[in-house]
UniProtKB/Swiss-Prot annotation:
This is UPF0260 protein MCA0521. HAMAP family: UPF0260 (MF_00676). Belongs to the UPF0260 family. InterPro entries: Puta_zinc/iron-chelating_dom, UCP006173. The lineage of its organism: Bacteria, Pseudomonadati, Pseudomonadota, Gammaproteobacteria, Methylococcales. Pfam families: CxxCxxCC (PF03692). It comes from the Bacteria.
């Protein structure tokens, strides 16, 4: 019998850095600005992306320096109790909740672009924060809800 994939065999805290990084599907949703409803605590996604996000590629243009350049960029390895703000489709959130990766995830599909082909990335909807005046005008209902 073949060995189970690492994400089945290990807890998130046990993953190597390479394994951790490979869990990212490249959707770009974590790089979108989010707002929190003060009354309900609901996380509202916007289509406004961090200035470092290459929207077409859904990749950070300064990944190694992102925490220095964007002080509120979160190191997910350091805040596992904060996964609730990640989209429901995020591998880190799914695995922390004991749920499987979706069929379109690159580790499951074997294709790096499967997240884009499945329409799960922000490459066709995001706009850079550098061209937006009012983030509140760009809230997108339900963006973080669907797997």
């Amino acid at each position: 019998m073949a060995d189970a994939p690492f994400w089945h065999a290990k807890a998130l805290a046990e993953l190597s850095l390479a394994e951790w990084e490979s869990l990212c599907d490249g959707c770009g949703k974590c790089c979108l600005h989010k707002l929190e409803d003060e009354d309900t605590g609901e996380i509202l996604y916007t289509r406004v992306a961090c200035r470092l996000l290459d929207i077409a590629a859904c990749r950070c243009t300064a990944y190694q320096d992102r925490f220095r350049l964007v002080p509120d960029c979160m190191d997910l390895r350091q805040v596992p109790d904060q996964f609730h703000w990640l989209p429901a489709s995020c591998a880190y959130r799914l695995l922390s909740e004991g749920r499987p990766l979706p069929a379109w995830h690159p580790l499951v599909s074997g294709a790096a672009d499967s997240v884009h082909r499945a329409g799960k990335s922000v490459c066709r909807l995001a706009v850079s924060e550098t061209v937006v005046d009012c983030i509140e005008d760009h809230v997108i209902e339900g963006l973080g809800d669907a797997v």
